[in-house]
Amino acid sequence: MTALTGLRVVELASERISFAGKLLADMGAEVILVEPPHGDPSRSYPPFLEDNPSQSLYFWHYNTNKKSVVLDLDTNADCRRLRNLIASADILLESEPIHRLAELRCDYDVLSTLNPQLIHVALTPYGRTNPMSDLPVTDLTLMAAGGPPWSCGYDDHSLPPVRGWGNQGYHTGCHFAYMSVL
């Protein structure tokens, strides 16, 4: 038995939230990764085991100890399945675009009536109501918006900062998501 044994987490596949799911799974929570029909996009991220593109070490690293289910959220039947899955969960992890969950009838207002005890963790780059909420985002833009790159690189700040490696912006957000759940 581990610290989070007995907790069920539903994670909507996204590289922005996957590390939070990994941390919860590694602590013993049952994490169910919801993937689109073509699979989590990170399944195609390098590096690959023996250069085989169907064996992504990146995907394996971020999804250890997770279960997986494929749902086509463009269909009503799979949207119902998602709502039923979330209704049985303790925690929902997602980083969906602002209006996506409302379109699926899976926003907090709907989900909280299905499961009043649900902990809904929405890892969004600029929140849900900020004027920048709909802007595209990458790990690099998150880091730049937060300021850490200016402390990376050289003492001479007339030189450009050095980009950190390894999805540091996503990891920082996921650490805070993980701590918020605990």
What are these regions (language model features)?
Residues 1-182:
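N-terminal helix-loop segment corresponding to the beta1-alpha1 unit
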